[in-house]
């Protein structure tokens, strides 16, 4: 079993008298910066000019160009989107890294797939909260935290692991528990979870169920409720207590249906496809395709995104959510762009 680290296992001294540069001020960036500052760490933010720069200054941070922030920092946490990191690293971060600095990531993609090759004179480690930035920030302010993974790729100073734990503690992660992993394990399992279960698997399952009911003559609105809207109720139960708690909480009829019908849907053929997905991740085939897609300015990504946003389940969903005051509408208008930020 994996070892779990808590507050008592981390020592803040590894961050004392050091400056941490947060590169990027999006979902994770704002949470890391504010949590670190509230933990007494000296934090600066590195950005390119734009709305994020203005927001970081509004939040009280000293903001610099990425290159200048790297130059001033002892620890550089790169929290830009995966596809933007290599160019920014090569042009603005790498030239300013000094011996003994720490280069830090929240996801191992670019290190593991050799899109970023760090110099030999710096520590390289990972601190990856297992939750979105707003949750990392909110739980911290409530005195709790979000679990995280740490991994060391390169330890020049002999203190990389201790610094990673200190960083994890400063953002609140050791309050919940921190697991040690490797860049390989974090990257491959994270991509697999997204593709086969949490995002790709789930959205395809929801759409297939919705389409099955609509094609059988049932009202799209009813199909939406049964296949998408109620998902939150089940996921909340799973989050609280795993599969057994969810099954304990639903009706016996639903549980019996789970037992006898679930394996018909997610069967050995599906598991075989999951293994193929994992193989594509492990061999770098997925990474190569995604890198090439970005280099070509995302033609397939954008086309699929537009098509998915026009699916009947999206149209029906927007109409139904507008009728539910207890559901905060997250998406007033779908705007398909080549990048989120």
UniProtKB/Swiss-Prot annotation:
Chain sites annotated for binding substrate: 251
Residue numbers binding Mg(2+) 1: 190, 194
All residue ranges annotated as the KARI N-terminal Rossmann domain in the record: 2-181
Record domain KARI C-terminal knotted: where: 182-327
Annotated binding of NADP(+), by residue: 25-28, 48, 52, 82-85, 133
Enzyme Commission designation: 1.1.1.86
Annotated transmembrane regions: none
Keywords recorded for this protein, A-Z: Amino-acid biosynthesis, Branched-chain amino acid biosynthesis, Magnesium, Metal-binding, NADP, Oxidoreductase
Cofactor(s) this protein requires: Mg(2+)
Cofactor note: Binds 2 magnesium ions per subunit.
A GO CC term attached to the entry: cytosol
Pathway annotation: Amino-acid biosynthesis; L-isoleucine biosynthesis; L-isoleucine from 2-oxobutanoate: step 2/4; Amino-acid biosynthesis; L-valine biosynthesis; L-valine from pyruvate: step 2/4
Enzyme class: oxidoreductase
Active site annotation, chain numbering: 107
Catalytic reaction annotation: (2R)-2,3-dihydroxy-3-methylbutanoate + NADP(+) = (2S)-2-acetolactate + NADPH + H(+); (2R,3R)-2,3-dihydroxy-3-methylpentanoate + NADP(+) = (S)-2-ethyl-2-hydroxy-3-oxobutanoate + NADPH + H(+)
Entry's Gene Ontology BP terms: isoleucine biosynthetic process; L-valine biosynthetic process
Keyword Magnesium: yes
Residues where Mg(2+) 2 binds: 190, 226, 230
Cysteine-cysteine disulfides: none
Function: Involved in the biosynthesis of branched-chain amino acids (BCAA). Catalyzes an alkyl-migration followed by a ketol-acid reduction of (S)-2-acetolactate (S2AL) to yield (R)-2,3-dihydroxy-isovalerate. In the isomerase reaction, S2AL is rearranged via a Mg-dependent methyl migration to produce 3-hydroxy-3-methyl-2-ketobutyrate (HMKB). In the reductase reaction, this 2-ketoacid undergoes a metal-dependent reduction by NADPH to yield (R)-2,3-dihydroxy-isovalerate.
The protein's name: Ketol-acid reductoisomerase (NADP(+))
Organism: Geobacillus sp. (strain WCH70)
Gene this chain is encoded by: ilvC
């Amino acid at each position: 079993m994996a070892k779990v680290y808590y507050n008592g296992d981390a020592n803040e001294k590894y961050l004392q008298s050091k400056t941490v540069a947060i590169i990027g001020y999006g979902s994770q960036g704002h949470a890391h910066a504010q949590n670190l500052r509230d933990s007494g760490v000296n934090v600066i933010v590195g950005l390119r000019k734009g709305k994020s720069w203005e927001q970081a200054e509004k939040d009280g941070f000293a903001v610099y160009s990425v290159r200048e922030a790297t130059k001033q920092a002892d620890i550089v946490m790169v929290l830009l989107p995966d596809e933007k990191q290599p160019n920014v690293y090569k042009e603005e971060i790498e030239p300013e890294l000094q011996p003994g600095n720490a280069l830090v990531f929240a996801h191992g993609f670019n290190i593991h797939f050799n899109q970023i090759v760090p110099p030999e004179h710096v520590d390289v480690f990972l601190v990856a909260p297992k939750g979105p930035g707003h949750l990392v920030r909110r739980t911290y302010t409530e005195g709790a935290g979000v679990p995280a993974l740490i991994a060391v790729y390169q330890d020049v100073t002999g203190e990389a692991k201790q610094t990673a734990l200190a960083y994890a503690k400063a953002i609140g992660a050791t309050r919940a528990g921190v697991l040690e992993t490797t860049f390989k394990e974090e990257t491959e399992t994270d991509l697999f979870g997204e593709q086969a279960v949490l995002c790709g698997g789930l959205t395809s399952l929801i759409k297939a169920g919705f389409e099955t009911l609509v094609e059988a003559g049932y009202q799209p609105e009813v199909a939406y409720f049964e296949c998408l809207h109620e998902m939150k109720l089940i996921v909340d139960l799973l989050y609280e207590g795993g599969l057994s708690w969810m099954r304990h909480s639903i009706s016996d009829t639903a549980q019996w249906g789970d037992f006898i019908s679930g394996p018909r849907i997610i069967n050995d053929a599906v598991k075989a496809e999951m293994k193929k997905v994992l193989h594509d991740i492990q061999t770098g085939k997925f990474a190569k395709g995604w890198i090439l897609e970005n280099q070509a300015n995302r033609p397939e990504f954008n086309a699929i995104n537009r098509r998915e946003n026009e699916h009947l389940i999206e149209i029906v969903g927007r109409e139904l959510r507008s009728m539910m005051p207890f559901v905060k509408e997250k998406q007033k208008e779908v705007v398909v762009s080549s990048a989120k930020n």
